[in-house]
Amino acid sequence: GMRYFGNCSTRCAGMFPSKRLENDVFLFSARNTNKIFIDESDLVLVSKERTCFSKKKPSVDTVVQLELYKNFEKINYMIHGHAFFKDEGIKTTTEYFPCGDLREINEITNAVGSRNVEWFLLNLKNHGFIIATDTLENMEKLLDLYKLEIKPFRQIK
């Protein structure tokens, strides 16, 4: 079948697309999900302890992103894709790590610098990009600024 790369996630804290459970529960796109047509059935609920509450497997990068959510407490949304930003002003990590490689956690954390940020956008060397924000509005602003047509966090009814 078709392979779909990249993923999206959100910290469940009363905003889309979660129902408020606890502050330590997250939604991740399921593995091999077409992100163009993502809906509620394509999301996998995962606890901060890495317990998965679905028959579907979450993204390979789930463990990496869970640790990034711990490192960056203000961050509530992340999108990771397998393309790159051409803008020279965007930082690029120095080392290549494949999907799900735990070494990428420190690489991203060090590249961002401060853990008290409300957003960050990085190119991941030979891997793609990651965008992380505190609010849906800030995510949409960054997506619009860089002319990305990624809208996985639309309202689900």
Stretches with model-predicted labels:
Residues 1-157:
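Glycine-rich flexible loops
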